[in-house]
Amino acid sequence: MKNGMLALILAGGQGTRLGKLTQSIAKPAVQFGGRYRIIDFALSNCANSGIHNVGVITQYQPLALNNHIGNGSSWGLDGINSGATILQPYSATEGNRWFQGTSHAIYQNIDYIDSINPEYVLILSGDHIYKMDYDDMLQTHKANMASLTVAVIDVPLKEAGRFGIMNTDTNDRIVEFEEKPANPKSTKASMGIYIFNWQRLRTMLVDAEKNNIDMSDFGQHVIPSYLESGERVYTYNFKGYWKDVGTIESLWEANMEYIGEENALDSRDRSWKIYSKNHIAPPNFITEDAEVKDSLVVDGSFISGKVNHSILSTNVQVRKGAEVKDSFIMSDVIIGEGARITRAIIGEGAVIGDHVVIDGSKDVQVVGYNEVVGVPNED
């Protein structure tokens, strides 16, 4: 390991607030931005930060995620001294069971972590959209001689009650942690990104299990326990773009923010690329009747209608007379002749029949995976 740090991505979340989009796949496997899945951002951050050993902890509906990650080659994680490992719940003689929380998922994978023997473990969520240099966070952790470092981002005070809030002294040492406080004292919100000194965390988790102490969740149990025991716990203050895409509205917003030559994620930054599994598709075909404005259009698309301020993923068809506006269309979608789609997310493989109207002007509308709306035209 280049920097002595193992990354563990928590990717087992169901994401119930995404409704139809997570009925058959885990939230980190949901598509984003035309050619990515949400987990690609955490994996790419690891690759760009020089972290070459990554464990991906799955649980709910893992098949699509497992197929997407494979051996990690798309992120350069398939070398001799590197690897991406899928970690799923299993039954052992000690009675291991389904993960009961974030830190319990780490406890159940102690054998894997010990086989890597890292000095530090980086805990990540697989369902956020952002770019971060984890090595810079590690250097801050070392400089503070911290036992635990928590990445935080400033949020508006009116929104702070939705997050775990860190109250710090003038040196960024955390003196108090409040989970979703009614009257927040700070605007430093936890991003769910942690660096732990592994041996200290390991000891805590093992002792808690032996003594039947609930230490299953980082926010509810581990961080408060660290603070109570006087551990050196600091924040890492992140200033870049970060989006929790846990709701339909936030997922739609993040995709709309991704459109444009100078988007918040700076998608054309060659020094910090976002990698993904490559899918071979033919070139786009845009007919002479088509009209495409201010949109991202990925390979394999066929457009004979109008597309405005939208994202078309791989192999999307927009047939004659159809109009798509302010929408995110996932891969392999067919939009029939004369259909009208506004402020919507259309799931993979969906079919929108001729002259169907999907109007999200009040609330963002969602069509699920392989869902058929209206009567499809077989031509």
Swiss-Prot record:
Q: Name one GO biological process term.
A: glycogen biosynthetic process
| One Pfam family hit | Hexapep_GlmU
Its recorded name reads: Glucose-1-phosphate adenylyltransferase
EC code: 2.7.7.27
Q: What does this protein do?
A: Involved in the biosynthesis of ADP-glucose, a building block required for the elongation reactions to produce glycogen. Catalyzes the reaction between ATP and alpha-D-glucose 1-phosphate (G1P) to produce pyrophosphate and ADP-Glc.
Q: Does the keyword ATP-binding apply?
A: yes
**Catalysed reactions, as listed in the record:** alpha-D-glucose 1-phosphate + ATP + H(+) = ADP-alpha-D-glucose + diphosphate
User: Where does this protein come from, organism-wise?
Assistant: Streptococcus equi subsp. zooepidemicus (strain H70)
Name its pathway.
Answer: Glycan biosynthesis; glycogen biosynthesis
The entry's family comment says: Belongs to the bacterial/plant glucose-1-phosphate adenylyltransferase family.
The record's note on quaternary structure and interaction partners says:
Homotetramer.
Which amino acid positions bind alpha-D-glucose 1-phosphate, per UniProt?
Answer: G164, E179, K180, S190
UniProtKB keywords: ATP-binding, Carbohydrate metabolism, Glycogen biosynthesis, Glycogen metabolism, Nucleotide-binding, Nucleotidyltransferase, Transferase
Record's keyword annotation contains Nucleotide-binding = yes
Annotated GO molecular function terms are: ATP binding; glucose-1-phosphate adenylyltransferase activity
